Amino acid sequence: MSQIDKASRRQKIKDRSRKQVHGNEKKPRLCVYRSLSQIYAQLIDDDNGKTIMSVSSMSKENRALEGTKCDVCRIVGLQLGEKAKAQGITKVIFDRNGFRYHGRVKALADGAREAGLVF
């Protein structure tokens, strides 16, 4: 499968799932983006169109992390869950953004669940 086919396939899945996934202030959308070497996660309030918080493997505290990509993703999920609990957010809607729920995306979700987020 060529790169263009993969990108268009992911975009179609993303568009289909975005019709059903909608976050608000009390239950924001946990949006995940996975690049080749990094991972980014945001809590988004779709009603107001604002990002509540974001955590990534590129942030200052995460740049020096050792281990596999999956280990780093789990740590990013833990950090996101801890920050969300500090702001009083316990329930979220998981948006895998067209990526398969497997590998690094699953590791981030498991880390967020370990930190106490419910989805």
UniProtKB/Swiss-Prot annotation:
GO terms for molecular function: 5S rRNA binding; structural constituent of ribosome. This is Large ribosomal subunit protein uL18. It comes from the Bacteria. This is one of the proteins that bind and probably mediate the attachment of the 5S RNA into the large ribosomal subunit, where it forms part of the central protuberance. It holds the Pfam family Ribosomal_L18p. InterPro entries: Ribosomal_uL18_bac-type, Ribosomal_uL18_bac/euk. Residues 1-26 are annotated as: Disordered. GO terms for biological process: translation. Residues 9-21 have a biased composition (Basic residues). Part of the 50S ribosomal subunit; part of the 5S rRNA/L5/L18/L25 subcomplex. Contacts the 5S and 23S rRNAs. SUPFAM superfamilies: Translational machinery components. The keyword Disulfide bond does not apply. One of its GO terms (cellular component) is cytosolic large ribosomal subunit. Keywords: Ribonucleoprotein, Ribosomal protein, RNA-binding, rRNA-binding. Belongs to the universal ribosomal protein uL18 family.
